[in-house]
Every structure is written in structure tokens, then in C-alpha cells.
Amino acid sequence: SASDRADALAFVARAARMNEAAVIRLQGRPDGRLGLWTHTGFDVLATRSIVGGSAPADIVCDAEQLRTVLAVADAGTRVDPGFTFASAWKGALPPASGYVHVDDVPARSVVELARSGAKLARTEGSAHGPATGLLDQVVLEASALDGRQPVAIILRSVFALTAMGFIRDADGREVTDTSELTRIADD
């Protein structure tokens, strides 16, 4: 669909913007969707799924090449992602199942954490970027209603969420560095 194509294009464009040598891993899922995966600059995997498939069912391609063909292709048409870059993919993907919903975190909280973290990274970082210790700092803990299964969320994950455009305001628009906090829902 056109919205799936737009989602894929936005995801791939953000990956390419974060890293000019970014690769995208396309992998068919058991539910009939296509998973798009990329390594962010924060050592965090990011993924998006769309309706679709690929042949072969698991392929690694250049993000910029894929962005270029997605930008000009009509919805519903097959795209050729170009040459495969299997050797450019580092590591394995996480399991396809076994996850549970633990809690919802308000978008405003994530944005405030990202902005505070960015400010601290600018003052405490170096020419090489933020210190690893800062990125690995737990900035939020989420847990189920019964208090079990606490999940520690580190700053690098918060940065990856915002850099990949996964945080939206109350109207569904992407939150940026200049977005007003009042436009982001409290809950």
C-alpha cells in the first residue's frame, strides 16, 4: 500500500541519514509481513514492518540504493533493492517471537529524556561523541502492573527511538528537536 511504501521510505531515509554506509536487512516474517532492520549509530537495532515480502526471503541491501528506488516506485510494484550486501550485516537478528508488552511510556517522557540526554552529551561528550558510560546509563525503568518483569531502558535506546522518528506528537507528526512539548500528549 501507499502508506506501507511511505513508512518503508521514511525508515530507510532515516537509516541512511544516520549512517551514509547504512545497510537494510529485509526479512520475510511468518505473519506475511516484511521486516526492515538497520543498525543505528547508537548500537541499537531498529525495525519496521510493512505488508509485503522479498525474494529471497532474507536480503541485505544498501540503504541509499533502496531509498532511491522506493522514492520513485509506484505503490504495489516490486522494487529491485540492488546488489546484496550480506557480508555488511553484523550480528544476528533477535528472535521473531517471545516478547511481551510490559508497559506504555508517555511520548513526552521519552522526548524529555532525549532532550536532557542530548544536552548532557553536548557538555560531557568529546569530539568523538557522547561517552559510552553516558549512553549506557539507565534513564527509565518500566514494569508490568504487578511490578514483575522490570525493564531497564538506557539512553542509547532513547536516542535511537527519537533519531529513527518513532516518537510522534498528539497529531501523529514526528517529534523533532524543535517540536513544542505542549503538542506532545501527556500520556
Model regions and ranges:
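A broadly used, surface-exposed interaction patch
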Residues: 45-81
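Long, compositionally biased intrinsically disordered terminal regions
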Residues: 76-187
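N-terminal ordered "arm"
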Residues: 1-51
